[in-house]
Amino acid sequence: MLHYLITPHVRRHRYSVQLVLPVPYDNLLKLELPTWTPGSYVLREYAGRLTNIRAYWEDNELPVRQVSKAQWVVDAAEAPVSATLRIEWEVFAYSVGIHDAYLDDDRGFINPSTLFLHPSNTNEPAEVFFDAPGWNVQCALPLRANAWQARNLDELLDSPYTLTPKDGHGAHIWTIEACGIPHQIVITGTNSLNQDRMSSDLRKIFETTIAFWDPDEKKPPFERYLLQMHLGAGLYGGLEHAAGTMLLEDPKVLPAEGETTPPKDYIEFLTLAAHEYFHAWLVKRLKPSCFLPYDLSKEVYSHDLWIFEGFTSLYESIIPLRADLIDEATYWEQFGRRFNNALGREGFDQMTLAESSFNAWIKLYRQTKDSPYSQTSYYAKGALAAFLISDALEQRSNGEWSLEHVLQSWFRTVRSKITDRTWSGLPDGGFAELVFELTGIPIADVIEHWVSKPNVDRCEWIAAFSTALEHRGKKLTLDANQHQAYALSGLKLRRSGADLELDYVPSASPAFEAGLFAGDVPIALDGMRITFERFDRMVEACAGRIVEIVFFRGDRLTVRQLDLASPRSDAFLMLLPQRVIDLS
């Protein structure tokens, strides 16, 4: 067994870590630190924050040699085979992120991949102690004899920790039950929360999701669930774990104590929570075969991330709808937003879903100003594919099967193998075969067309989408809520510190034709100073004219003519936002 001891050093924003373990049989201990975190497919290079690694046998310091960016070898030739080794190191922890480590006076967080140096090629149990007077520690692992117990390395690296001051300052910790399972909620970063409202709504999310996956017994695949969340201005994100999740949110989206009507963006939080909770089944149990087990030392490639993130993105809004947390109008509004997020980028038909999945390591998580023109997201586009696949299943089975039924059947079929760790995962590109095995319905042609076939034009997607919507009594129409001239200009502002920057500028738009690009800082339009609050109205006032726009590109002041009078190209018009409405 591996024995870890973690000590926080608040003023230095560091954790010191000690690992005690037996001397290996060949007297050479090979240690490594993960380079990425499951669920976040980009190399994070955590070893860059690790310092002062030392090795000891009793009071004797042993040689430590670094052999790669994240691997070390301890020469324990001087130590007898029956001895124990003590490895010590420090990790800098001052990054607010779901996949990082953080420590200050108010809060600590540990994503295990950032901290746990471990022997190579091992999967043995581990226990984690904290020397942290004045702190409460929360983790999804079982706690026995003051140590958090992990059955294996995978469980150790999948169980994050939140540290909160024992005086309770800025921390909200409570437990709710869903289908008989305790769900602990740990929220830091705010002094006021309406816990009763959040408890009621989260319980509905949890119970609805459990019923989705196990409609008969309503039994989740974990004995305890831990939702950890930190709040801060402008924060947003989530990362799934087998028995919990780590979320980031802006405090403005949550109801404060005594606030009876939640903020307008509260549904954003509920949707995020539903997304990550859904992942406890789809990603943490049902997963690609290449992730069994995870190799966190290098990139691990899959063409199927569109399944695991795209399907989840589809159901993240369906769950709140079924839980009666949003109405049908809000659901279809979110649906339309997802449609626009995908098809509003020119990169939508520049990459297949299989390519987008495979290239996650260098594209999705490494966005550039060119990304909207050349890339698509397997989240948003994957959700559209999921919708079309489900519609095809429904049509070919006369309503007997849908994607939901496939997921339920899939989990039911392999659940026992997942529990006893004998399941080998979904082979790369094997979803069509899986569907046929479960349903007897051939669906390979549909998946091949929407997932792997290159150069499928967005017109085909829109046509297929329109047909699928008709089956549900819905149709697409241009979003009349958008200011027409503003939408037709290709100009979209975002805040960047004290500046206002242009976001993605579609090619063939008037803004693009005028030479504007993402990152430019517009300061005046038609002789008037630009402000964020009135920018759309300013553009509306220029409709049908050619006007002057003044902007900075870097430190250079530039003046261009913006043509808002000429007809727009069909290619650009296809990028305009649409919404879903009733057929009648």
List each model region and its residues:
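Acidic/His/Gly-enriched intrinsically disordered linker/tail segments
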Residues: K287-Y294, E299-Y379, K417
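Juxtacatalytic substrate-recognition/specificity segment
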Residues: H172-D304
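Extended, low-hydrophobicity, Ser/Thr/Pro/Gly-biased non-transmembrane segments
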Residues: P34, E88-D167
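Beta/coil-rich, acidic/histidine-enriched accessory regions frequently appended to metallopeptidases
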Residues: M1-H3, T7, H13-Y15, E88, ...
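Early extracytoplasmic/domain-onset interaction patches
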Residues: M1-W36
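A surface-exposed beta-strand-loop module
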Residues: T7-H9, S40-L103
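Pan-zinc metallopeptidase signature
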Residues: A342-G425, F431, A444
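Solvent-exposed beta-hairpin/edge-strand motifs
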Residues: E32-E61, P125-P142
